[in-house]
Amino acid sequence: MSASYPALRLRRTRSTGWSRRLHAETVLTPADLIWPLFVVEGERVEQPIASLPGVSRWSVDQIVARGREARDLGIPCVALFPYTQPERRTEDGREALNPDNLMCQAIRALKDAVPEIGVLTDVALDPYTSHGHDGLVDAAGYVVNDTTAEMLVAQALNQAAAGADIIAPSDMMDGRIGLIRTALEAESHHNVQIMSYAAKYASAFYGPFRDAVGSRGLLKGDKKTYQMDNANAEEALREVAMDLAEGADTVMVKPGLPYLDIIVRVRQAFEVPVFAYQVSGEYAMLEASVAAGAGDRDALVLETLMAFKRAGCSGVLTYHAAHAAKLLNG
């Protein structure tokens, strides 16, 4: 920088609203958002989730209504997560392979009613297992990698056949991206994208999500043998490199705000779209601060989402998607 004060006044371009907009380095729009939605059985059902104030589980007909709302707000994609009734949960999570399971019903309904909306689907077994883990467990309670990966391939094909646009494996099994990509190609699902949860950390911020899908009370122990250690950053780059080499189109970092440094490093190291998941605990924490009078919801929502974009994200999965889109649309 050659100039100095007073010739250089950095406040000069901040002095008016139009100038601040003109010089903004980062732009946030509704097109940057993905809206996570929880699906439950029934008709005309809305079930508020106590640990996620303002978020509900919706029956399939109501999911379609949310899809129309997303379209009208300019949100390009919704993400689906099923609440599986306890009687449908098994040790092996076989309900994940049912072509008429809740996830597949919701996919078909959305693609029939709102075909212009992208549908992202979660690939993992935790919504379907009686033990709450993302994969199959052995007699010692260890989540086994390779047999789980085979099950995930079948789950991904089931969702793709129903019409899913983006398959998003969140399980963190080694090698599953390559297996899923090979299977999708073999079944002529050439345009089905894979968004890999490449850097998914074993985090304390997932609690409300587990309430939402009904797995919190089922889980024994933790997921530290397959999700990443929150002390590690270099390992995240290895995970991303592995998933890209196996055929992932985009990658995700999860959670979001506590891992902005990982987002920056991934974006700098790889010229691919990077997404973040502003997870349930982050959402609940923000809502709790608003309820305590510690800040303005609108300002906090937009500032946190802008932080993801500034760090290098192409988009953000956030439970605030509809609210943020309304703010951004004026």
Outline where the language-model segments fall:
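Alpha/beta enzyme core
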Residues: S2-Y5, T16, L28-I34, V40-G330
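Acidic, Ser/Thr/Pro-rich intrinsically disordered transcriptional activation regions
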Residues: R11, W18-S19
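A broad, low-specificity signal marking well-ordered, structured residues that form hydrophobic/aromatic
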Residues: L22, W35
